[in-house]
A protein has these predicted regions:
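Expand to "…catalyze enediolate/carbanion chemistry for C-C bond making/breaking, isomerization
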Residues: 1-259
Length: 259
């Protein structure tokens, strides 16, 4: 099976049938390597999908430079909690992109209760620069002292909803993610009037309030992630074993001389 071909077709179907707008990668928690990002870029481009990359910090200039080289369509700054962090992100983007920054999405990850408390000021600082926010429920719930198993419950919903309402009022694209699975469907349907998108770990989807559609879309998005992980595993396994026969021959050759 040609995994790359299978993945390309899978991505085309995600876009055509399920309203997927982009695929995600991370320099941050996921720690994507450059060769992985090049591989991902080669997979998403034929499908006509965007590539959104989460950088390692609000002013991770090296990561932003890599995003530019990879022709990322969006850059996300993680763990933004203050207006000053937005300013740092803005300055870093301007340093690398200059006038061309208008061609990419500039997104912040709203993922702590501290960010929530400072969100009005964050929006003021980001006016004219930011294009969207993504509420990260996993870290958000942890910062609220809520266990991950309760991520779908009302307390997390209320904060996520308020984040998204304020973002949309400010003219930004509102998105949320964090441990998204089929069990998240009631949460997605309930918050649908206040969001534009939602995301799994690897896929950004257009919102819907149709439970059957959402179930198919989420499962198909998770299947893409599984296929991609298999491709990564295959790639690194091949790298790890490509010299194994040469190693065996050299060991035999050296040992025969020593004897």
């Amino acid at each position: 099976m040609n995994l790359r071909r299978v993945i390309r077709e899978h991505l085309k179907k995600l876009k055509a049938d399920f309203g997927v707008v982009a695929v995600k990668a991370e320099f941050e928690a996921e720690g994507s390597r450059k060769d992985e990002l090049i591989m991902l870029r080669e997979l998403v481009e034929p499908a006509g999908l965007g590539l959104v990359i989460k950088i390692g910090g609000c002013e991770a200039v090296h990561d932003i430079d890599q995003c530019k080289l990879l022709d990322a369509t969006g850059i996300m700054a993680p763990m933004v909690e203050t207006p000053f962090a937005v300013k740092k992100f803005h300055n870093a983007i301007d340093k690398i992109y200059g006038e061309n920054s208008k061609n990419i999405e500039k997104i912040i990850n709203a993922e702590t209760i501290t960010c929530y408390k400072n969100f009005d000021e964050i929006l003021v600082e980001g006016k004219g620069f930011l294009t969207g926010i993504t509420v990260g429920r996993s870290d958000l719930s942890a910062s609220m002292g809520i266990e991950r198993k309760h991520i779908e419950e009302q307390e997390v919903f209320d904060v996520t909803e308020n984040f998204c309402k304020k973002a949309k009022k400010a003219g930004l694209v509102a998105n949320f993610g964090g441990n998204i699975g089929v069990e998240s469907i009631p949460f997605i349907m309930k918050i649908s009037p206040h969001i534009d998108r939602f995301e799994t770990r690897k896929v950004i989807l257009t919102k819907s309030d149709d439970p059957d559609f959402l179930k198919k879309a989420i499962v198909y998005a998770l299947e893409f992630e599984l296929l991609y992980l298999r491709l990564k595993s295959e790639y690194y396994t091949n790298m790890a074993t490509e010299d194994s026969q040469r190693i065996i021959r050299l060991e035999k050759q050296i040992n025969s001389v020593k004897q």
